[in-house]
């Protein structure tokens, strides 16, 4: 089973994934971007570089990472539990302001070969929560875009998930990121085991 965690920065995806590593020791854990050697380099370029990219170039770099990760690492483990920090859903949500959703879905279908998550854990945060957590960290180039940007992305994630429910067989668990870490963890484990 392939499970992806979605949500904007600072909603606790990484925290929950770290907790799951203790419960599901045989699972494959990955992230997008950066789940493969190519992805590590692309992530560094995209998030830390001072280089400027066109929106189309940025989209294609994310797609290249996804294609490589899925073809080389995930498909061969498709019969295992795979847990990913982000997936094509983020790509579609982040790019929806610049590209048609149908084109984005088709590009992601091509890049993934149709290998999509069966379950999505969507962590949703309030403006106050995101603001508070962003203020406590060193920001990368995307995080520097600010709270309003992340609220727009969060709305785009929700819209994208609604669209995807009509296109692919997917189960979605939406959780309030302000719940306690333990409460979130229990709900997520139950969803995975269901």
Swiss-Prot record:
GO MF term (any one): ATP binding
ATP-binding listed as a keyword: yes
Keyword set, alphabetical order: ATP-binding, Kinase, Nucleotide biosynthesis, Nucleotide-binding, Transferase
EC number: 2.7.4.9
Pfam hit, one: Thymidylate_kin
An example Gene Ontology biological process: dTDP biosynthetic process
InterPro entries in the cross-refs: P-loop_NTPase, Thymidylate_kin-like_dom, Thymidylate_kinase
GO CC annotations, alphabetized: cytosol
Chain sites annotated for binding ATP: 7-14
Domain of life: Bacteria
UniProt family annotation: Belongs to the thymidylate kinase family.
Biological role stated in the UniProt entry: Phosphorylation of dTMP to form dTDP in both de novo and salvage pathways of dTTP synthesis.
Protein name (database record): Thymidylate kinase
Organism lineage: Bacteria, Pseudomonadati, Campylobacterota, Epsilonproteobacteria, Campylobacterales
């Amino acid at each position: 089973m392939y499970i992806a965690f979605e949500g904007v920065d600072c909603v606790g995806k990484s925290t929950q994934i770290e907790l799951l590593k203790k419960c599901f020791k045989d699972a494959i854990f990955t992230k997008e971007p950066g789940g493969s050697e190519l992805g590590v380099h692309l992530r560094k370029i995209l998030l830390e570089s001072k280089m400027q990219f066109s929106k189309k170039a940025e989209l294609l770099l994310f797609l290249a990472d996804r294609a490589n990760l899925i073809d080389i690492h995930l498909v061969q483990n498709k019969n295992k539990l795979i847990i990913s920090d982000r997936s094509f859903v983020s790509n579609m949500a982040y790019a929806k302001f610049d590209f048609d959703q149908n084109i984005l879905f088709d590009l992601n279908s091509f890049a993934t070969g149709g290998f999509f998550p069966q379950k999505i854990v969507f962590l949703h945060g309030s403006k106050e929560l995101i603001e508070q957590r962003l203020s406590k960290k060193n920001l990368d180039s995307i995080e520097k875009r600010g709270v309003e940007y992340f609220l727009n992305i969060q709305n785009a994630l929700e819209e994208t998930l609604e669209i995807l429910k009509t296109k692919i067989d997917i189960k979605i668990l939406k959780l309030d990121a302000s719940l306690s870490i333990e409460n979130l963890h229990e709900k997520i484990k139950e969803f995975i085991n269901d």
